[in-house]
Amino acid sequence: MEHQLLSVAIDDTDSQYGGCTTHLTGLILKELGNRALLADYPLLVRLNPNIPWRTRGNAATVLRLLYDGDPKELMETLWSIIEEYTEPRPPLPGKSPGLVVAPGSPWESERLRWLYRKALSDVVTLDVATESLSKYGALWRGGRGVIGAASSLAALSPGEPYTFELTFYRRPENWGSRRCVYSDKVAYLEGQSSGTLNNLELDEGTTSAAPGGPDPVLAGFRGTDPGELWRFDEALCERPHFAVLYRSNQHTGVHLQAQEPRIYRSVNITVTVRSPPLKLPGGHVIVEVSDGVNTYDAAFYEDSGPLARAAELLYPGDVIIIAGGVRPYSPRGKLTISVEAMKVVGVAQRRVQVPPRCPRCGARMESLGRGKGYRCPRCGLRSSGHKQSLVVERELLPGSYYYKIGRARHLSPVGARLPTMDRLPVTINVSDVLRVY
């Protein structure tokens, strides 16, 4: 039988007992072995991070295959693997695995591209997802996970920016125990690399690539050069089970879209600062902003580092572009935008009122009290002059500000220049992206 192009998408298999959709995808790759050629790298697709009922990282996976078998038989085989995987590790409460098998090139479908964009920045319901699949002619099975699986089919099309994540998985006997990753070695490899992203928190010297939960991930290293990423196995002091190289939309900022702020949306809007920043206990900064129609509270969190420090320097009248997630109303009755990135477009002129200079000696005079005039501290001259207005030099400069490296959310941009893929499909061997230790 001639090879046909198929896309397999999976979501919602995460479990508090150790399940993980990317881990399951790696097991499926091992099962497929040389029976299928890949038409792309395995895809790790992050969706809207602001959905409260999402899985931990709100990620689905997609395998684009050149397959010579029956799509329905593949569907049944994969569903059996999913059932076998999730039976001893039930999905998180309210979750239900989803599987989609789609023929052809779903990244060329206008409807599926629309679905992907919506799932990145808004809420998608199951009926919208299944209607899109039905119109395209895809097969699907499962529950809520079908939403993420369907929404990921058109991700990472030619021309879109992308990054890589090389994920190392733990041996089952090590699940739940403390991970062993040499932070010093990670720091050394970071220093030797030109295309790594968000793997190390420099201030604390910790490895952000290593998670802390009971899931089977040992560490996931991100960057733009697969060759550099494979070197990070030198930083592991725990023998991994296997590793998978994913192409991903992580750190592309693709979810931050220009649209009206509504609860749970991801937005990218131009606003004007309306009031001086309010610094809260703990270091968080709240700034009241307006888009000309509505006002919002822009929240800059302490762990964002340079982003929060820049927010402290904002001043009424500054024009900024803020990108982030919309949260429910704040105590002040406004929608809150949790800021992931900010671009300062225009810095307002800041003026202060100061006492006049002494007309005799030129020293700055001192106020004698409300309505009592001024006195020169140098020569003693008294005067009933008026305050002067002076322009104060602003410390804040126009430009882009991002989260501190090591603390950026999965999709948040980090200011790096990212590659794009010219065409699809391509031909990749499973052995190029899967390594068993």
Curated annotation (Swiss-Prot):
One of its GO terms (molecular function) is ATP binding. It is found in: Cytoplasm. The keyword Ligase applies. Its EC number is 6.3.4.22. Gene3D superfamilies: 2.40.50.1010, 3.30.70.2200, 3.90.600.20. InterPro entries: TiaS-like_TCKD, TiaS_FLD, tRNA_Ile2__agm2C_synt, Zn_ribbon_TiaS. Transmembrane segments: none annotated. Keywords: ATP-binding, Cytoplasm, Ligase, Nucleotide-binding, tRNA processing. GO terms for biological process: tRNA wobble cytosine modification. The keyword Ligase applies. One of its GO terms (cellular component) is cytoplasm. It catalyses: cytidine(34) in tRNA(Ile2) + agmatine + ATP + H2O = 2-agmatinylcytidine(34) in tRNA(Ile2) + AMP + 2 phosphate + 2 H(+). It holds the Pfam family TiaS_FLD. PANTHER family: DUF1743 DOMAIN-CONTAINING PROTEIN, TRNA(ILE2) 2-AGMATINYLCYTIDINE SYNTHETASE TIAS. Belongs to the TiaS family. ATP-dependent agmatine transferase that catalyzes the formation of 2-agmatinylcytidine (agm2C) at the wobble position (C34) of tRNA(Ile2), converting the codon specificity from AUG to AUA. This is tRNA(Ile2) 2-agmatinylcytidine synthetase TiaS.
